[in-house]
Amino acid sequence: MSASHNLSLFFESLDLSKERLELLLEAFYPMLKAAFCISLPLAIISFILGLFIAVFVALIKIAPPKHFVHKALLAGVNFYVSLIRGTPLLVQIVVVFYGLPALGVYMDPIPAGIIAFSFNVGAYASETLRASFLSVPKDQWDSSLSLGLNYLQTFWHVIFFQALKVATPSLSNTFISLFKETSLASVVTIAEVFRIAQQKANASYDFLPIYLEAALIYWLFCLVLEAVQKRVEKILN
Protein backbone atom coordinates (compact mmCIF):
# COMPACT_ATOMS: atom_id res chain seq x y z
CA MET A 1 0.00 0.00 0.00
CA SER A 2 1.54 3.34 -1.09
CA ALA A 3 2.21 6.25 1.22
CA SER A 4 -0.15 8.47 -0.80
CA HIS A 5 -2.96 5.93 -0.34
CA ASN A 6 -2.31 5.81 3.41
CA LEU A 7 -2.39 9.60 3.54
CA SER A 8 -5.66 9.62 1.62
CA LEU A 9 -7.19 7.16 4.09
CA PHE A 10 -6.01 9.34 6.98
CA PHE A 11 -7.75 12.45 5.65
CA GLU A 12 -10.86 10.45 4.82
CA SER A 13 -10.98 9.33 8.46
CA LEU A 14 -10.99 13.01 9.45
CA ASP A 15 -13.99 13.83 7.27
CA LEU A 16 -16.04 16.14 9.48
CA SER A 17 -19.60 15.30 8.55
CA LYS A 18 -22.52 16.65 10.54
CA GLU A 19 -22.88 13.35 12.40
CA ARG A 20 -19.19 13.26 13.26
CA LEU A 21 -19.23 16.86 14.50
CA GLU A 22 -22.18 16.01 16.72
CA LEU A 23 -20.27 13.00 18.03
CA LEU A 24 -17.19 15.10 18.77
CA LEU A 25 -19.23 17.76 20.52
CA GLU A 26 -21.02 15.08 22.52
CA ALA A 27 -17.67 13.59 23.59
CA PHE A 28 -15.93 16.91 24.25
CA TYR A 29 -17.83 17.98 27.37
CA PRO A 30 -17.41 14.68 29.28
CA MET A 31 -13.68 14.66 28.48
CA LEU A 32 -13.27 18.30 29.48
CA LYS A 33 -15.19 17.66 32.69
CA ALA A 34 -12.98 14.64 33.40
CA ALA A 35 -9.89 16.80 32.87
CA PHE A 36 -11.08 19.36 35.43
CA CYS A 37 -12.69 16.99 37.92
CA ILE A 38 -10.48 13.88 37.73
CA SER A 39 -7.18 14.31 35.86
CA LEU A 40 -6.15 17.68 37.28
CA PRO A 41 -7.10 16.94 40.94
CA LEU A 42 -5.46 13.51 40.63
CA ALA A 43 -2.25 15.17 39.43
CA ILE A 44 -2.33 17.92 42.08
CA ILE A 45 -2.96 15.60 45.04
CA SER A 46 -0.38 13.07 43.85
CA PHE A 47 2.19 15.81 43.23
CA ILE A 48 1.77 17.34 46.70
CA LEU A 49 2.04 13.96 48.43
CA GLY A 50 4.97 13.09 46.19
CA LEU A 51 6.77 16.27 47.24
CA PHE A 52 6.51 15.27 50.91
CA ILE A 53 8.02 11.90 50.02
CA ALA A 54 10.70 13.59 47.92
CA VAL A 55 11.73 15.99 50.70
CA PHE A 56 12.05 13.11 53.17
CA VAL A 57 14.10 11.03 50.73
CA ALA A 58 16.33 13.97 49.79
CA LEU A 59 17.00 14.80 53.44
CA ILE A 60 18.00 11.21 54.15
CA LYS A 61 20.34 11.28 51.17
CA ILE A 62 22.13 14.55 51.98
CA ALA A 63 22.42 14.03 55.74
CA PRO A 64 25.85 12.76 56.85
CA PRO A 65 25.55 9.11 57.95
CA LYS A 66 26.27 9.03 61.69
CA HIS A 67 24.60 5.89 63.02
CA PHE A 68 23.09 2.58 62.00
CA VAL A 69 19.49 3.86 61.77
CA HIS A 70 20.44 6.50 59.24
CA LYS A 71 22.47 4.01 57.21
CA ALA A 72 19.49 1.66 57.17
CA LEU A 73 17.18 4.49 56.06
CA LEU A 74 19.67 5.50 53.37
CA ALA A 75 19.76 1.95 52.03
CA GLY A 76 15.96 1.85 52.07
CA VAL A 77 15.46 5.12 50.18
CA ASN A 78 18.16 4.20 47.65
CA PHE A 79 16.34 0.93 46.98
CA TYR A 80 13.01 2.77 46.68
CA VAL A 81 14.36 5.33 44.21
CA SER A 82 16.10 2.66 42.14
CA LEU A 83 12.97 0.48 42.07
CA ILE A 84 10.61 3.28 41.03
CA ARG A 85 12.96 4.80 38.46
CA GLY A 86 13.73 1.38 37.03
CA THR A 87 10.15 0.19 36.47
CA PRO A 88 7.38 1.58 34.22
CA LEU A 89 4.72 3.74 35.86
CA LEU A 90 2.02 1.62 34.21
CA VAL A 91 3.37 -1.47 35.98
CA GLN A 92 3.44 0.39 39.30
CA ILE A 93 -0.22 1.39 38.94
CA VAL A 94 -1.27 -2.15 38.06
CA VAL A 95 0.71 -3.62 40.97
CA VAL A 96 -0.90 -1.25 43.48
CA PHE A 97 -4.46 -1.82 42.25
CA TYR A 98 -4.42 -5.45 41.14
CA GLY A 99 -1.44 -6.83 43.06
CA LEU A 100 -2.01 -5.58 46.60
CA PRO A 101 -5.38 -7.38 46.96
CA ALA A 102 -3.36 -10.62 46.88
CA LEU A 103 -1.84 -9.41 50.17
CA GLY A 104 -5.25 -8.53 51.58
CA VAL A 105 -4.99 -4.81 50.79
CA TYR A 106 -8.02 -3.57 48.86
CA MET A 107 -8.64 0.00 47.71
CA ASP A 108 -10.74 1.95 45.25
CA PRO A 109 -9.23 2.99 41.90
CA ILE A 110 -8.62 6.66 42.76
CA PRO A 111 -6.73 6.03 46.05
CA ALA A 112 -4.71 3.35 44.26
CA GLY A 113 -3.87 5.79 41.48
CA ILE A 114 -2.89 8.50 43.96
CA ILE A 115 -0.58 6.11 45.82
CA ALA A 116 1.13 4.93 42.63
CA PHE A 117 1.53 8.44 41.22
CA SER A 118 2.73 9.87 44.56
CA PHE A 119 5.48 7.32 45.02
CA ASN A 120 6.53 7.76 41.40
CA VAL A 121 6.75 11.54 41.78
CA GLY A 122 8.55 11.12 45.11
CA ALA A 123 11.33 9.07 43.54
CA TYR A 124 11.96 11.42 40.63
CA ALA A 125 11.47 14.69 42.53
CA SER A 126 13.79 13.52 45.32
CA GLU A 127 16.74 13.64 42.94
CA THR A 128 15.75 17.13 41.81
CA LEU A 129 15.44 18.34 45.40
CA ARG A 130 18.64 16.63 46.50
CA ALA A 131 20.59 18.44 43.78
CA SER A 132 18.94 21.76 44.66
CA PHE A 133 19.68 21.32 48.38
CA LEU A 134 23.32 20.62 47.58
CA SER A 135 23.44 23.71 45.35
CA VAL A 136 23.11 25.95 48.43
CA PRO A 137 26.65 26.86 49.58
CA LYS A 138 27.87 24.65 52.42
CA ASP A 139 28.97 27.65 54.48
CA GLN A 140 25.30 28.54 55.00
CA TRP A 141 24.79 25.16 56.65
CA ASP A 142 27.91 25.63 58.77
CA SER A 143 27.02 29.20 59.79
CA SER A 144 23.49 28.24 60.81
CA LEU A 145 24.66 25.25 62.82
CA SER A 146 27.29 27.37 64.55
CA LEU A 147 24.55 29.82 65.58
CA GLY A 148 22.78 27.05 67.48
CA LEU A 149 20.21 25.92 64.92
CA ASN A 150 19.80 22.17 64.62
CA TYR A 151 19.80 20.29 61.33
CA LEU A 152 16.05 20.54 60.68
CA GLN A 153 15.86 24.21 61.73
CA THR A 154 18.73 25.04 59.39
CA PHE A 155 17.07 23.14 56.58
CA TRP A 156 13.68 24.83 56.99
CA HIS A 157 14.71 28.42 57.79
CA VAL A 158 17.82 28.76 55.65
CA ILE A 159 18.11 26.09 52.96
CA PHE A 160 14.65 24.98 51.85
CA PHE A 161 13.32 28.10 50.13
CA GLN A 162 16.62 28.86 48.41
CA ALA A 163 16.70 25.32 47.09
CA LEU A 164 13.02 25.44 46.09
CA LYS A 165 13.75 28.39 43.82
CA VAL A 166 16.43 26.34 42.06
CA ALA A 167 14.18 23.27 41.82
CA THR A 168 11.03 25.03 40.58
CA PRO A 169 11.64 24.65 36.80
CA SER A 170 12.31 20.91 37.09
CA LEU A 171 9.44 20.36 39.52
CA SER A 172 7.09 22.26 37.22
CA ASN A 173 8.07 20.00 34.34
CA THR A 174 7.50 16.99 36.60
CA PHE A 175 3.96 18.20 37.35
CA ILE A 176 3.16 18.78 33.69
CA SER A 177 4.42 15.29 32.85
CA LEU A 178 2.37 13.89 35.72
CA PHE A 179 -0.80 15.51 34.36
CA LYS A 180 -0.25 13.75 31.04
CA GLU A 181 0.60 10.47 32.77
CA THR A 182 -2.76 10.45 34.54
CA SER A 183 -4.00 8.93 31.27
CA LEU A 184 -2.42 5.68 32.52
CA ALA A 185 -5.00 5.62 35.31
CA SER A 186 -7.48 4.41 32.70
CA VAL A 187 -6.11 0.88 33.18
CA VAL A 188 -7.58 0.82 36.70
CA THR A 189 -10.94 2.17 35.48
CA ILE A 190 -10.46 5.75 36.71
CA ALA A 191 -12.74 7.87 34.51
CA GLU A 192 -10.15 10.44 33.46
CA VAL A 193 -9.86 11.98 30.00
CA PHE A 194 -8.45 9.00 28.14
CA ARG A 195 -10.86 6.56 29.78
CA ILE A 196 -13.80 8.68 28.63
CA ALA A 197 -12.27 8.86 25.15
CA GLN A 198 -11.99 5.07 25.06
CA GLN A 199 -15.61 4.66 26.08
CA LYS A 200 -16.84 7.13 23.45
CA ALA A 201 -14.64 5.63 20.74
CA ASN A 202 -15.68 2.06 21.53
CA ALA A 203 -19.35 3.05 21.45
CA SER A 204 -19.11 4.85 18.09
CA TYR A 205 -16.25 2.92 16.43
CA ASP A 206 -14.91 6.34 15.42
CA PHE A 207 -11.52 6.10 17.09
CA LEU A 208 -9.18 8.58 15.43
CA PRO A 209 -11.21 11.82 15.77
CA ILE A 210 -12.11 11.13 19.40
CA TYR A 211 -8.55 10.23 20.37
CA LEU A 212 -7.30 13.36 18.60
CA GLU A 213 -9.88 15.34 20.56
CA ALA A 214 -8.54 13.84 23.80
CA ALA A 215 -5.00 14.74 22.72
CA LEU A 216 -6.16 18.30 22.06
CA ILE A 217 -7.57 18.59 25.59
CA TYR A 218 -4.29 17.37 27.11
CA TRP A 219 -2.36 19.80 24.93
CA LEU A 220 -4.52 22.79 25.86
CA PHE A 221 -4.17 22.02 29.56
CA CYS A 222 -0.41 21.68 29.18
CA LEU A 223 -0.23 25.05 27.42
CA VAL A 224 -2.00 26.65 30.38
CA LEU A 225 0.25 24.84 32.87
CA GLU A 226 3.35 25.95 30.95
CA ALA A 227 2.13 29.55 31.05
CA VAL A 228 1.64 29.27 34.82
CA GLN A 229 5.11 27.73 35.12
CA LYS A 230 6.72 30.64 33.28
CA ARG A 231 4.81 33.12 35.44
CA VAL A 232 5.95 31.44 38.66
CA GLU A 233 9.56 31.31 37.47
CA LYS A 234 9.41 34.99 36.56
CA ILE A 235 8.11 35.86 40.04
CA LEU A 236 10.82 33.78 41.73
CA ASN A 237 13.53 35.39 39.62
Report residues per predicted region.
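Transmembrane alpha-helices and adjacent helix-loop boundaries
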Residues: M1-N237
